[in-house]
């Protein structure tokens, strides 16, 4: 291959995979990291557990008994609900809302504007009115999961909504209550998945 180019080459059997790995290197070299530490403009509960290596930007709210792991990066305007767990090295971009009792694994990425842990659609007819079915379950997200911008993930009604390791969601994806996504599932943009749907791995 040396005769095909006068400059450096990356040579391998899987060119697309090598391209992906190269983009990761260039991103690290070129992106502006968040300002390290905890902003004085963040609102953090005294009962929250925050790693000393975490970054929490301005106008965030970290609620009671939340647990923020090592090297977590949280952008501005993020809300973390009560008793929610954020695993090590996870990145949460600006204006994400994560409700109470959500568990997010390590090295995940959640892009701007997404909502995790809201109630699903659950009502029972009573005469001319609707009686709300409270959602008592959780959202449990594995490791290395990426969630695009403006996604909404409902908590379980009684059981849990679960995303296994390596799941990837494009922008504007909706997961209704009790959805189960198997390892390495990929969901394209503008997809809505109905409640209690199970999708297998890969």
Predicted regions span which residues?
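Short, basic phosphate-binding NTP loop
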Residues: 1-46
């Amino acid at each position: 291959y040396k005769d095909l180019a006068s400059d450096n080459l990356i040579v391998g059997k899987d060119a697309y995979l090598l391209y992906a790995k190269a983009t990761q290197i260039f991103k690290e070299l070129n992106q502006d990291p968040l300002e390290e530490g905890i902003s004085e403009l963040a609102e953090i509960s005294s009962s929250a557990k925050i790693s000393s290596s975490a970054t929490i930007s301005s106008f965030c709210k970290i609620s009671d008994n939340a647990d923020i792991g090592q090297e977590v990066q949280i952008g501005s305007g993020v809300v973390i609900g009560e008793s929610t767990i954020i695993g090590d090295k996870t990145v949460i971009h600006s204006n994400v809302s994560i409700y109470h009792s959500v568990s997010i694994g390590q090295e995940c990425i959640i892009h701007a504007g997404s909502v995790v842990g809201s109630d699903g659609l659950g009502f029972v007819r009573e005469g001319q009115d609707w009686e709300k079915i409270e959602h008592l379950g959780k959202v449990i997200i594995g490791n290395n999961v990426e969630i695009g911008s403006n996604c909404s993930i409902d908590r379980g009604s009684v059981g849990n909504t679960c995303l296994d390791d390596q799941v990837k969601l494009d922008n504007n994806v909706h997961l209704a209550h009790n959805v189960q996504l198997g390892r390495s599932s990929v969901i394209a943009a503008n997809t809505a998945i109905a409640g209690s749907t199970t999708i297998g791995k890969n």
